[in-house]
Amino acid sequence: MSQEKYIMAIDQGTTSSRAIIFNKKGEKVSSSQKEFTQIFPQAGWVEHNANEIWNSVQSVIAGAFIESGVKPNQIEAIGITNQRETTVVWDKKTGLPIYNAIVWQSRQTAPLAEQLKSQGYVEKFHEKTGLIIDAYFSATKVRWILDHVEGAQERAEKGELLFGTIDTWLVWKLTDGAAHVTDYSNAARTMLYNIKELKWDDEILEILNIPKAILPEVRSNSEIYGKTAPFHFYGGEVPISGMAGDQQAALFGQLAFEPGMVKNTYGTGSFIIMNTGEEMQLSENNLLTTIGYGINGKVYYALEGSIFIAGSAIQWLRDGLRMVENSPESEKYARDSHNNDEVYVVPAFTGLGAPYWNQNARGSVFGLTRGTSKEDFIKATLQSIAYQVRDIIDTMQVDTQTTIQVLKVDGGAAMNNFLMQFQADILGIDIARAKNLETTALGAAFLAGLSVGYWKDLDELKLLNETGELFEPSMNESRKEQLYKGWKKAVKATQVFAEVDD
């Protein structure tokens, strides 16, 4: 009797690494998770030890095997999904990083980004990469490492160093240095990749003086990149055959295969991505243009809007204000509020993301009266998440001149039924919550399984992650628009308050 086969997804996130084993039905068989150290050398800087990340991945692979009893030779293929933009530069010979990984959140390269803007490169970079010039993306992080580690530039030019985002680093380690590759979705977040011509952009590399020799080869999101070295996978030689940045993996895991389909992951922040099909569309309203995924010889583009504070607003109610003991409790309090929704919380704790991009804005509250209760405040905080999502959905509809019919949702805060119902009401469209909320890891597993024939095609995948629950709008049009108008007023006032005094 032949043994059952499985797919393993490695989900390397910002605070922890996870390994999840999925079966043919797309169900989770086992998972293992390990946190690692956040390094803050200075205010606003965030770094990780890339070796510690690698150790944590080795540990969770073992944990997933131990928990399930599945053997390494029962894994048909491995899919990798990762925190995007985070940058590692390492020695080709020893495999040791020459500096800590600089994390996507880190602002240590902001002066470099400002310098590029002042030199007039904004439009050029936007047209080529689809991105706005920002310290968020990998380009300035690579430049910073080459500038600040003695002899690094010279060694990079000699071909002694390699660069990669976390996907590249993990494949290189798992294959024991046999494969130095990345995928379309991760390459598109480096600010070095021309997403129209699908190649590293020579002009941008020249502007930043980054040697081409250090860059990985860019491949599709679903193909065999290499096999695990047996001593790194507990004796198994298993193909690594699917890869995508976390938000793009969630798009794929949500089965958003058709142009116009949109998903939102309600995590710490909120990431809304729309599949725009094979045509690249540049946003005129401060959304990012990126690559969703590339499979079967075709590349599918996407528009992305990022909200900095979503689930973390609920954490703030819990840890900062001590208004709730745990996150799910926020739903009960919100339902107990009986005010007329006239309180607005604008959670701009780290500035406002898309479509405002105002880094000076700070959190504010409007509409308080003597009668305002804790319940009202908690409800207004949950509603602020939904209002921010509407800001982006409205912008996407303007950019693409389409009408979005349904929003597919996942992530921790998507479990909050009050928030999901209010989201449906304020958007006036259906909200489809995935049955399996592990959409990021599932997306990586789907990409890996497709390329080795574990799943036949996209049609087979469509049967595996149905909608768990549908939330339909129940608010009348005039009420909906009146509430949203109040939100826009609150955001405007927040921005006025943030203006720098002369």
From Swiss-Prot:
Gene (name only): glpK
Top-rank taxon, per record: Bacteria
Modified residues (Phosphohistidine): H232
Keyword terms: ATP-binding, Glycerol metabolism, Kinase, Nucleotide-binding, Phosphoprotein, Transferase
Binding site residues for glycerol: R84, E85, Y136, D246, Q247
Annotated InterPro entries: ATPase_NBD, Carb_kinase_FGGY, Carb_kinase_FGGY_CS, FGGY_C, FGGY_N, Glycerol_kin
Entry protein name: Glycerol kinase
Enzyme class: transferase
Binding site for sn-glycerol 3-phosphate: T14, R84, E85, Y136, D246
PTM annotation, UniProt: The phosphoenolpyruvate-dependent sugar phosphotransferase system (PTS), including enzyme I, and histidine-containing protein (HPr) are required for the phosphorylation, which leads to the activation of the enzyme.
GO cellular component: cytosol
Record keyword Zinc-finger present: no
Subunit and partners: Homotetramer and homodimer (in equilibrium).
KW ATP-binding (keyword) present: yes
Binding-site residues for ATP, renumbered to this chain: T14, T15, S16, T268, G311, Q315, G412
Residues binding ADP: T14, R18, T268, G311, G412, N416
Catalytic activity field: glycerol + ATP = sn-glycerol 3-phosphate + ADP + H(+)
EC number: 2.7.1.30
Pathway noted in the entry: Polyol metabolism; glycerol degradation via glycerol kinase pathway; sn-glycerol 3-phosphate from glycerol: step 1/1
Similarity field: Belongs to the FGGY kinase family.
